[in-house]
Structures are given as structure tokens and as C-alpha cells.
Regions:
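Well-ordered secondary-structure scaffolds
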Residues: 1-252
Length: 252
């Protein structure tokens, strides 16, 4: 979701955007995730490029070149030196890991785990359905249902999860067509099989060390390979909601 938000804001003309990452990102939809810059130095998503940077000078240099900046900084130590106007917590941890309403003039939290008016100024609904992208000014987002959103009529079966703690070894790549029952990767030498026919829309990076139960793959039953390289409708909706929240704050 963070990449969809960053893409939306940058496309709308907000050019000073910094994405803070962990040292070993665990993104699944990697071809549309700016966190890949942590590994590769840069990542382009739908015409917008992010550069990996090591310090504040690097952040400002990326901005001057019209790029997004991606910095490994899981504890958000960069914020004070940059004087952020807006902070968006897009960790999607289902709980608040330490974000405070005092972190910036406008603090936005995505999904359950935040209370608008208490630990953040606004909460964005992330659950698929009628209220996706709703801006919540007071209170909570919907609780985590535990059921993935429906895509092409598929929910649980389209998601791949780690069967054990261990290291991932991929046997296919993003964009490959897979069949139900096919082994698409192993985790700690245990096979992970596709639950449905479809296109591998997302796949965690090969060699990643993962905990049991983590989402490590995403199969799209619609079969359109082009979806692998474009931002999802969910991320666009949430990105639009964040943009609306920022513009509403500016105009008040």
C-alpha cells in the first residue's frame, strides 16, 4: 500500500516523499513496490522512480532529481532532521507499533490498530468492500476479518503462506502462469503449492527468511500478466484517500 500512496502523491505533484523501510523488506507484489530499491538501488513503478539513499543528504539529492527516496530506517530516526509535514503509517501491522499524533502536523494511519483523534489524526479504511478508502475522522477502521479480499471470486486459496519458519526458494517468478497443485516455492525445504490456476501476481524475494504463516505469494485467477506491473485498485483507492486527507488539511 505504501508504494501506491507514494505514487499517487508524487503524481499529484508532491515531490518530497521519503519511504522508510526495514533492512530486509518482505513485499510480495515486488514489481510495483518501491522497497525493491533497498536491494537494487532503484525501482520504477508506473513511471515514478525511487532511489535508495543512506542519509539526509541523499534524501535531498533524490528529491532534487525528481525521485522518491527510500531509506532503511525502521525506527523513523530520519523524521526530526527532515521536519516532516505529513506522516503516513503504512506498515499494516494491524496494531500501532509506536506512531504518535505528535509525529507531524498531519499523521495518518492505515487500517485497524489506530484511533483517529488519539494516536493519529485520520485513519484510512483498508478493508475491501463498500467502505474501502473511507477517511475516518474519529474512531477505528474495521477490525481485521482474517479473510483476504476477493479477486476473481477467490479469497483464501489465492494467497500463499509460509508453512514453516525458514528461507524461501522460489521455483517460479512473478508473471508466470501456474496451476493448482503446482509447487511454486519451498520454505525450509517444505513445498508450497498453488491453490488455484492463475498468474503469480506477487512473490516474496528469493532467499528471504520468513516466519510461519507470513504471506509469501499472491496468485491472480484473472490471468492478466499486465496486472503484475500495475498498482492495484485497492492501493489506488487508499492512495486517493491519503491525497484527499492531505489536501483537506491544507485547505482548512
Amino acid at each position: 500500500m505504501a508504494s501506491g500512496i507514494a505514487w499517487t502523491l508524487h503524481t499529484a505533484g508532491m515531490t518530497r516523499i521519503l519511504l522508510l523501510e526495514v533492512a530486509a523488506p518482505l513485499a510480495v507484489r515486488r514489481r510495483v513496490s518501491f522497497c525493491e530499491a533497498v536491494h537494487d538501488g532503484r525501482q520504477t513503478v508506473e513511471g515514478v522512480t525511487a532511489l535508495a539513499v543512506a542519509d539526509t543528504a541523499g534524501v535531498r539529492s533524490a528529491w532534487a532529481d525528481g525521485r522518491l527516496a527510500v531509506r532503511v530506517d525502521p525506527e523513523w530516526r530520519s523524521l526530526p532532521s527532515l521536519g516532516a509535514d505529513v506522516v503516513v503509517d503504512a506498515i499494516l501491522a494491524k496494531r500501532n507499533l509506536g506512531t504518535r499524533i505528535s509525529d507531524a502536523r498531519l499523521v495518518i494511519g492505515l487500517g485497524p490498530g489506530f484511533t483517529a483523534g488519539e494516536d493519529v489524526h485520520r485513519v484510512i479504511e483498508t478493508q475491501r468492500g463498500h467502505h474501502l478508502g473511507r477517511v475516518i475522522e474519529a474512531g477505528l477502521a474495521a477490525a481485521n476479518s482474517g479473510v483476504p479480499g476477493s479477486i476473481g471470486g477467490e479469497t483464501v486459496r489465492r494467497i500463499l503462506r509460509a508453512p514453516a519458519n525458514g528461507v524461501v526458494a522460489n521455483q517460479v517468478s512473478i508473471g508466470h502462469q501456474v496451476s493448482a497443485g503446482q509447487t511454486v516455492m519451498t520454505v525450509a525445504d517444505r513445498p508450497v503449492t498453488a491453490g488455484i490456476d492463475g498468474v503469480m501476481r506477487g512473490l516474496i524475494r528469493d532467499g528471504s527468511r520468513v516466519p510461519r504463516g507470513l504471506k509469501i505469494g499472491d496468485i491472480d485467477p484473472r490471468g492478466d500478466v499486465g496486472y503484475c506491473d500495475t498498482i492495484s485498485e485497492k492501493a489506488r483507492a487508499i492512495g486517493g484517500a491519503v491525497l484527499l486527507t492531505i489536501m483537506s488539511s491544507v485547505c482548512q
